[in-house]
UniProtKB/Swiss-Prot annotation:
One of its GO terms (molecular function) is lipid binding. The lineage of its organism: Eukaryota, Metazoa, Chordata, Craniata, Vertebrata. Transmembrane segments: none annotated. FABPs are thought to play a role in the intracellular transport of long-chain fatty acids and their acyl-CoA esters. This is Fatty acid-binding protein, liver.
Amino acid sequence: DSANFDEYMKAIGIGFAMRQIGSVTKPTLIISAEGDHVTLKTTSTFKNMEWNFTLGEEFDETTADERKTKSTFTVDGDKLVQVQRWEGKETTISRAVSGDSMVATCSIGDVVCA
């Protein structure tokens, strides 16, 4: 469960209905890498998505809530850090594996969800 997730979704512009879906969706994330090339797959009862990208290189991403963003992934220690930019906004999503689960911290402006 993520503290402050609804506030984060509001801050990035997600409407009420999508926030309700987002608050109960528990996606499975699979990350695989070969050198700097990474494949990230999410599966859930709501939507399945896949992104292929090279670390440090910006690419066009369509998010699960249909935002069109410019995204860049980098590695910072044991974290996979994603920066999304769209319509003058910017959000950072930091993902770290702890045991058999992933901990994600999302931020936009002064709104932080962990």
